[in-house]
Amino acid sequence: MAVDKGRRPVPPERRAQGRKRAEPGDVTIRETRTRPVHTPEPEPELLAKDGILELEDDDDNDDDDDDDDDDKSNHHDGAPKNEDDMEAFPELVSGKDKDDDGDEDEEEDDEDEDEDASDDEAFDSDDLENWDEEADAKYGDADLSDDDDVKEGDAALERMIARARVKPDESERTTNKLGIDTGVAARFYDESRNDDGSKRGRVVQSHVTGMPKVEYPPIEPEYDSDSSTEDVPNRIGQVPLSWYDDLPHIGYDINGRRVLRPAQGDELDKFLDSVEGEGDGWFSAHDKTSGQDVKLTDEELDIIQRLERAQIPVEAYDPYEPATDWFTQHQQTTPLTARPEPKRRFVPSKWEHKKIMKIVRAIRQGRIVAHAPGRERPAFYNLWSDADEARADHPMHMPAPKLPLPSHVESYNPPAEYLFGDDEKAEWEAAEPEDRKLPFLPAKYAALRLVPGYDQALHERFQRCLDLYMAPRMRRKRLDIDDPDQLLPKLPAPRDLRPFPTHTDVVYAHAPWRIRTVSIDPSGAWLLTGPDDGHVRLWDAALGRCVATWDMNAGVARADRSPVYCVQWCPNRTFGIAAAVSVGRVTLLAPPQCGKTMYEASLAHLTTPHAAEDAATAQWTRASEADRAAGVCVRIDVRNNKHASLVPKYVRWHARGDYFATVSPEAAGEAVLIHQVSKHRSQAPFRRTRRAGNSAMAVQCVCFHPSRPWLFVATQRYVRVYDLVQQSLVKTLQPGVRWISSLDVHPSGDHVIIGSYDRRVLWFDLDLSERPYKALRYHSRAVRAVAYHPRFPLFASAADDGTVHVYHGTVYSDLLQNALLVPLKILRGHAVQDALGVLSIAWHPTLPWLVSAGADGDARLWTP
């Protein structure tokens, strides 16, 4: 057996001690060991021929660390159990590998020689056989002590390096219930359980997928159950517990049994609870509902500790979480579409210009002030000053209308007069639902508990919802006026405006014929009436005696006879002439009863001129000597272009008495004709007065201006003012009514009064507006006639309700002051026949007298 020269053999124990590497954190334990004494066995059985026994350095091969660990454990446990364990440590090198590893062995030998030159000495195999263990004991102990010092230094160095390499723990310090750090405190539960006492899961292989999975233990009621679903024994609700201060119980459970008050300990018991046991007294809170001390959980204690440290109660919440810009962190360089940019992207916006100009105008007007000082606020103010103020509603907020309050008929025990009889019940059932006054049948019950359910409740609630959703709402401003009389204008008393007609003085009877028209001559002594029998009657106005009668249908077939539609005296006092229209012609009368001088002047004025030969619209004819002696002077036959007779129904004189106009509503271009008495000539000033198929343009009446050459033409809905000299339209009055019935012009010429079939009387101020100045709605039926008094500030209106309304109307010369209109008197005396009342009225030319003609066949003179 060859042994490497220059090396000192080391016993197996020293070899094992030298190859052992100290681990970081290990604590070296020195102990005295007894070296085992044994008889060496023959070497040829262990080593091959020419084998070499080499001890490698600890730093040469890192793969031997695992073996070192095993030897280390054996070293600490004591002496090796057998010799095989001791001798298995060295590496056995065979002779055939010597050549291959020669260079490596030489390098290792050189290193070993340099390190152990002072310690190792060469000896041969005979020395190994004659090894003296006792002699080498002292030397071995000294060598072991040196090795222990080296290992202690290496272990300290390794610990320093390990501490330098470990990343510092930046997590917050956690403590248990007693305030001790959980890193150094003893665990209450073993490793198989979590800190809260629940069992930990274990990783097992799935039988289905074959993959590892976490298998959790079954839930234990003591640790894993949730107490949030447990029933609370005390079921008193949110009531003050002070109610039970003087009672032995603190409430009732779900079964209605009393929950007795638990025994309460004194201060000594509380102190003992906090000292003895596990210290649960420090982690308990008193529950007022149950009267017991409830132990707080770890989560609740953690929340309390976080609140004490002014931290967020939720541990998982991160207030400083880095914000991730999901939409703009990656710039998109590829466009979605290749469409060219529109022109509006390069042209200034028109709407932005308007908005900017709006702001500029506000700045110029001073509504927007740049750098305006803010409103000064007081340094000290009442914090709760506006706490009780109601919040302002939205500007467009309109509250829903409230439902009507229930009445006696909706009672379950209504009075007998509210109950329906058999006939009323049958009528209610036969009527449509929208025509019924009540949506239900009133019923009577002896007690409220006997009232059945209302079957229409859901339907009524649905209709209410429809009304709130579909019906538009309107806001009406209400005036906060204590005295309603403040709304009425300050008008003078009627007694201060006398004289005006108040009662009937004379009655002119025409029974059974209704009187369509009435007129008083300029002197006021004579009265003309036109009833339906076709005769014009002359009356003495003061006495009420009929003086003369003229038949307007003389020479006309019985089938063509017609009533007298209108009669009008000439306003010229020089002549006593009257015009009456009926059966398609106009008759000029000169009553001889008016006086011989006036009769002769009137007759000469009517019969001297000659009629025009080329008259196409009207034919003037002188009456016979007998007719002229009776008072009939001239007849005018009104014809159209086809020589068909027309029916004029209205006549009106000019203020000078030489012209008068007639109206035929059914005619077209010749509805209005102007006749000149001095020349016996008639003409149509309008070529077309009604459009084809438009009855609203039909002429109803006309009137001359008292001082200007103006003609007022009233159609169904409008009043047009024409200048006859300039042949132009001056203005159009817009009454806003459906059908105009009558028209009259004030003696001053600046005001117009209009009556309509929709029960309204309208006053117009021509200098003020084309709209009505006043609208009087005092009649209950259609207005038939209106008239101004020639001298007094009076005007009147007659309607089908059988009444005549007298008004006071003062017109001021000052244009800045409006007219004063005052209702004075309602004259009642005419009876309504066939829905017709008073058909015509006329004022006395010099006295405050009024004559009215009605459908009852009477004409009445009203005086003060």
UniProtKB/Swiss-Prot annotation:
Localization annotation: Nucleus, Nucleolus; Nucleus, Nucleoplasm
Signal peptide: none
KW Secreted (keyword) present: no
Comp. bias intervals (Basic and acidic residues): 1-52, 72-83
Keywords: Nucleus, Repeat, Ribosome biogenesis, rRNA processing, WD repeat
Gene Ontology MF term list: ribonucleoprotein complex binding
Record's compositionally biased regions (Acidic residues): 53-71, 100-135
Main subcellular location of this protein, as a coarse class: nucleus
Gene3D superfamilies referenced in this protein's UniProt entry, alphabetically: YVTN repeat-like/Quinoprotein amine dehydrogenase (2.130.10.10)
Coiled coil: none
Region (Disordered): 1-153, 191-231
Any one of the GO CC terms: nucleoplasm
WD repeats (start-end): 509-549, 559-599, 694-732, 735-774, 778-817, 833-864
One GO process term, biological-process aspect: maturation of 5.8S rRNA from tricistronic rRNA transcript (SSU-rRNA, 5.8S rRNA, LSU-rRNA)
Cross-referenced SMART domains: BOP1NT, WD40
Statement: the UniProt record of this protein carries the keyword Nucleus: yes
Role, per record: Component of the NOP7 complex, which is required for maturation of the 25S and 5.8S ribosomal RNAs and formation of the 60S ribosome.
Description of how the protein assembles with itself and partners: Component of the NOP7 complex, composed of ERB1, NOP7 and YTM1. The complex is held together by ERB1, which interacts with NOP7 via its N-terminal domain and with YTM1 via a high-affinity interaction between the seven-bladed beta-propeller domains of the 2 proteins. The NOP7 complex associates with the 66S pre-ribosome.
Stated family: Belongs to the WD repeat BOP1/ERB1 family.
Xref: HAMAP family: BOP1
Record's protein name: Ribosome biogenesis protein ERB1
